[in-house]
A protein has these predicted regions:
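Generic structural signal for short, flexible, solvent-exposed coil/loop and linker residues
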Residues: 36, 47-51, 57, 71-83
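Short S/T/G/P-rich N-terminal loop/turn motif that feeds into the first structured element of a domain
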Residues: 1-37, 41-54, 88, 92-105
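Short hydrophobic/aromatic beta-strand micro-patches
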Residues: 8, 59-61
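An amphipathic, aromatic/His-enriched active-site/gating alpha helix that lines ligand/cofactor pockets
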Residues: 62-93
Length: 105
C-alpha cells in the first residue's frame, strides 16, 4: 500500500538554518535504507522536498502506517518535523474501480 509522509518543520529547525537538523538530514538517506529493513516497508518510492514550504513529501510502499511512524521516529524525522501519514491510491487504480462499478450497474 502506498502512503504519503508529509513532514513539516519550522524555519528555525530547517536543515538549511539549524546545525542539528542538518546533521540529521545529511544522514537521512542512509538511515532510511537501514531502518526500513526493520519494518514492513517495501520501498521508498520517491522523496521530494519544498525548501520554501519547509516540507518533505516521502512516498512509501509499506504494509502498515504504524511501521512508517516508527521509521520516522527512528530516523529523526519526527524530532524536527510534524509528521502526517496519509494512505494514497494511484489515479489509474481508482478509475479502474470506478469503471468496474459502472459496468456492473
Amino acid at each position: 500500500m502506498l502512503f504519503g509522509v508529509f513532514a513539516t518543520h519550522s524555519p528555525e529547525s530547517c536543515p538549511m538554518n539549524n546545525e542539528s537538523s542538518k546533521e540529521t538530514f545529511l544522514k537521512l538517506k542512509n538511515q532510511l535504507d537501514v531502518e526500513m529493513k526493520k519494518y514492513n516497508i517495501n520501498k521508498i518510492v520517491e522523496f521530494y522536498m519544498s525548501v520554501l514550504e519547509h516540507q518533505w513529501i516521502i512516498i512509501i510502499d509499506a504494509i502498515h502506517a504504524h511501521d512508517i511512524e516508527k521509521l520516522c521516529i527512528d530516523t529523526g524525522i519526527a524530532s524536527t518535523s510534524i509528521v502526517k501519514i496519509v494512505p494514497l491510491n494511484r489515479y489509474e487504480d481508482i478509475t479502474k474501480k470506478m469503471q468496474l462499478k459502472k459496468n456492473k450497474l
